[in-house]
A protein has these predicted regions:
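Conserved alpha/beta-domain cores
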Residues: 27-170
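Conformationally flexible catalytic loops at phosphate/diphosphate-handling active centers
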Residues: 1
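Long, charged amphipathic helices and adjacent flexible linkers at domain junctions
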Residues: 4-42
Length: 170
């Protein structure tokens, strides 16, 4: 965001107008909760949420999402100082799947690298990290980390509709 220190009257008026527009949009979206999602041509669609951790679940449920289209599992790794255990990951995934109560949950496997660095991974600096060793490439070069995550995901899948997304595969 942008911080305005001692904004002038014109800037203050613009920000108040923007705030009013956002509140109106929020109010209109509230009216759509609980209704079927349809395109203009009448086709029913599902709207899924994208989340980074289980703390986002309340907002997902509050906003009536049809499921989770992307759970960014890398934040489990980024929010700590050492590799998460299988049990720690399992408990997180299980909580997400159970909370969604039968709705589809798509969890992306570890997508570390490029803009998401994790100190304890001890990754080499790269000229172009976006195209370098990241995501599935890291998982395949560090199978012990990948297998731990996959075991946790497979265990959690017994508690709901869990699907797995593999990043950076074309």
């Amino acid at each position: 965001g942008v911080l305005y220190v001692e904004p002038d009257e014109e800037t203050l008026a613009q920000m108040k107008e923007k705030q009013a527009q956002q509140e109106e949009q929020k109010r209109l979206l509230e009216l759509l909760k609980g209704r079927e999602n349809k395109t203009l041509d009448g086709k029913t669609i599902q709207l899924y949420a994208n989340i980074g951790n289980s703390k986002d679940l309340a907002a997902v449920l509050q906003n009536d999402a049809g499921g989770i289209g992307l759970f960014r599992s890398e934040f489990i790794y980024l929010e700590r100082e050492d590799f998460p255990t299988e049990e720690e990951q399992f408990q997180i995934y299980k909580t997400v799947v159970q909370t969604m109560a039968g709705k589809r949950v798509i969890i992306r496997t570890l997508d570390i690298g490029a803009d998401k660095q994790c100190e304890y991974f001890h990754m080499d600096k790269e000229d172009n990290p976006a195209m370098g060793c990241r995501a599935i490439r890291i998982c395949l070069t560090r199978p012990e980390i990948f297998k731990t995550q996959l075991r946790a995901l497979f265990r959690a899948s017994a508690f709901g509709k869990l699907a797995i997304m593999y990043p950076m595969i074309t």
